[in-house]
């Protein structure tokens, strides 16, 4: 049974049964078969959970209760109510960009994508049940007047970079979760921002529909409102620009209003926001007052628990159709239910799932990660009409590899250690095949070579989606920090020597003979070469013997001491530097680094 998911802004109050029926009637037999198999697996898991709860003994339930009580105490000790976390989510982003650039799309139901798949839809289309992730041909059945526009992802990326620069002014470590969503920690900004701010505002009106944001003709005229009239260079109709000023106060709510205002002024696009003590809650809140609104959840435990009490579990990020079915098997419908029935988790779920569900029930963020927070992989995939024609698959494969290599270059990534091929068959079953070559996969040729090797093993299969992924990534910044090779080390030393020789301001106390060791007989610094040192020692021994001096113990210089040579005094060093046979010189620090 296919079910329609209406847990998205702008889709409240829809007739789910009617929409589900239309989807089922227009779904291919292959996908229906796949969906039934998937549903069968879910039902097996649900039955397993119900049986486990029925057979759990009293002792098991008591043990489970104690376990969750201890875990709750541990998690509560980590609750942090001091942060001002914000989730900014652009409103119907891809669709909004297209409507901004084409005024004719603003008053009709429209979506971005193709007949195969939609990326997003505007709010008018959502009233018909049209949403992201839905095939375009089914969307046309739900909304015959739907206009589908091909995606222009370079344009969406460019606009995203524009408003992300605004976010960085408030939090230099802003987390861009996607092109249209950002996590901003306003804590430091709010603490330091103690004065009101005033910004100049512009809005557009007149016969010209080209420009956003629009001026509301019903708005009460403000005292400082100024109007500038001109002819639009796009449509050549009369255009009015209304100028005035907007003031923003202090505090996190005002800061978020300020951010949203600046984004709209810069791009003509609106965004919504959620404000809370952590990003998990902020993301939930960002969906509540869409479009073009914001929701604030007080930094108070009681307020948080009250907020979560009646919240449907599907509103929480990470809880999808499968997880929802498993929780409903325990009669859990809301996040409040998750808290009431937390003692059942150890009976049915793994320790990681137990902690994850309890964190959600308590309104706490996910487990902190000690691993590298940067992306773990980068991939490109495409959906197309099912085919087993290998020539067609090769064309798709080459284009996907080209796009992936381009994304790798733009993302500051050197390459990856593992190549993965993803295939979705005409039956909708998904296959993944991976390969880890001996060398890092960096170039387009490497990506094509290794992924093609995997693809050739799947010849004859009817495929509807093809993707290539690089994982175990190596970043450019890592390459810069890596240990230097011996060659690089000596090249750098040579450069230091050249720079030092060309300098006239070298302190005598800061230089010594380069690449020398003291003679074990006379203490003189001698070039650190075995033949030179042996020759010098022989000369010293002969000289001492000819001078009728005391008998000396010959020290073998072939077996180098593991200790650092005794450094001659500063006075002796200066004398040595004045000798005509003095060699090149480097700094003392560089010498000891090399000798140590």
From Swiss-Prot:
Region (Disordered), start-end ranges: 559-584
Catalytic activity: DNA(n) + a 2'-deoxyribonucleoside 5'-triphosphate = DNA(n+1) + diphosphate
Pfam family, one: IMS
Residues where Zn(2+) binds: 519, 522, 536, 540
Subcellular location: Nucleus
Matching SUPFAM superfamilies: DNA/RNA polymerases, Lesion bypass DNA polymerase (Y-family), little finger domain
Entry's EC annotation: 2.7.7.7
Annotated positions binding Mg(2+): 89, 180
Top-level EC class: transferase
Main location: nucleus
Listed GO MF terms: damaged DNA binding; DNA-directed DNA polymerase activity; zinc ion binding
Lineage top rank: taxon: Eukaryota
Residue numbers annotated as active site: 181
Gene Ontology biological process terms in this record: DNA replication; embryo development ending in birth or egg hatching; error-prone translesion synthesis; reproductive process; translesion synthesis
Skewed-composition ranges (Basic residues): 570-584
Chain positions of site Substrate discrimination: 94
A Gene Ontology cellular-component term: nucleus
PANTHER family associated with the record: DNA POLYMERASE KAPPA, DNA REPAIR POLYMERASE UMUC / TRANSFERASE FAMILY MEMBER
Free-text note regarding domains: The catalytic core consists of fingers, palm and thumb subdomains, but the fingers and thumb subdomains are much smaller than in high-fidelity polymerases; residues from five sequence motifs of the Y-family cluster around an active site cleft that can accommodate DNA and nucleotide substrates with relaxed geometric constraints, with consequently higher rates of misincorporation and low processivity.
Name used for this protein in its record: DNA polymerase kappa
């Amino acid at each position: 049974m296919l079910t329609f998911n209406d847990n998205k802004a702008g889709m409240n109050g829809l007739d789910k049964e009617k929409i589900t029926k239309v989807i089922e009637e227009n779904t291919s037999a292959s996908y229906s078969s796949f969906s039934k198999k998937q549903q069968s697996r879910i039902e097996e898991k649900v039955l397993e959970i119900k049986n486990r709860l029925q057979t759990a003994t009293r002792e098991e339930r008591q043990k489970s209760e104690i376990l969750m009580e201890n875990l709750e105490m541990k998690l509560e000790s980590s609750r942090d109510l001091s942060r001002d976390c914000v989730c900014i989510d652009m409103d119907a982003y891809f669709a909004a960009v297209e409507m901004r650039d084409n005024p004719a799309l603003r008053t009709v139901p429209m979506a971005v994508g193709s007949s195969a798949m939609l990326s997003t839809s505007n709010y008018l289309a959502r009233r018909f049940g049209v949403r992201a992730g839905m095939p375009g041909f089914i969307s046309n059945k739900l909304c015959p007047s739907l206009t589908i526009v091909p995606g222009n992802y370079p344009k969406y990326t460019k606009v995203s970079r524009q408003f992300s620069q605004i976010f960085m002014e408030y939090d230099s470590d802003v987390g861009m979760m996607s092109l249209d969503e950002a996590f901003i920690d306003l804590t430091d900004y709010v603490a330091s921002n103690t004065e009101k701010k005033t910004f100049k505002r512009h809005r557009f009106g007149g016969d010209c529909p080209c420009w956003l944001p629009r001026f509301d003709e019903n708005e009460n005229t403000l005292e400082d409102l100024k109007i500038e009239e001109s002819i639009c260079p796009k449509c050549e109709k009369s255009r009015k620009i209304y100028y005035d000023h907007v003031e923003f106060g202090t505090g996190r709510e005002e800061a978020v209003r300020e951010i949203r205002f600046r984004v709209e002024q810069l791009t003509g696009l609106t965004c919504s926001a959620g404000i809370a003590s952590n990003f998990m809650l902020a993301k939930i809140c960002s969906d509540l007052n869409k479009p073009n609104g914001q929701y604030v959840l007080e930094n108070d435990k009681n307020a948080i628990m009250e907020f979560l009490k009646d919240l449907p579990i599907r509103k929480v990020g990470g809880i999808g159709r499968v997880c929802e079915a498993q929780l409903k098997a325990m009669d859990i419908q809301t996040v409040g239910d998750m808290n009431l029935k937390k003692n059942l988790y150890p009976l049915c779920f793994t320790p990681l799932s137990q902690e994850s569900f309890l964190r959600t029930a308590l309104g706490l963020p996910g487990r902190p990660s000690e691993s590298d927070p940067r992306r773990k992989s980068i991939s490109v995939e495409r959906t197309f009409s099912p085919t087993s024609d290998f020539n067609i698959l090769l064309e798709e494969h080459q284009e996907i590899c080209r796009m992936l290599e381009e994304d790798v270059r733009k993302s500051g990534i050197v390459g990856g250690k593992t190549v993965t091929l993803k295939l979705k068959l005409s039956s909708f079953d998904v296959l993944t095949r991976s390969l880890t070559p001996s060398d890092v996969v960096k170039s387009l040729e490497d990506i094509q070579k290794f992924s093609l090797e995997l693809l050739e093993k799947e010849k004859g299969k009817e495929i509807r989606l093809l993707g290539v992924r690089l994982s175990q990534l190596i970043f450019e910044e890592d390459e810069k920090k890596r240990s230097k090779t011996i060659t690089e080390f000596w090249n750098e030393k040579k450069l230091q020597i050249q720079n030092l020789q060309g300098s006239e301001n070298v302190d005598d106390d800061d230089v010594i003979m380069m690449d020398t060791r003291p003679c074990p007989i006379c203490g003189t610094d001698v070039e650190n070469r075995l033949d030179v040192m042996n020759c010098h020692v022989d000369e010293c021994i002969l000289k001492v013997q000819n001078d009728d001096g005391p008998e000396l113990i010959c020290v073998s210089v072939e077996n180098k001491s593991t200790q650092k040579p005794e450094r001659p005094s500063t006075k002796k060093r200066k004398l040595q530097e004045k000798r005509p046979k003095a060699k090149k010189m480097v700094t003392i620090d560089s010498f000891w680094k090399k000798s140590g």
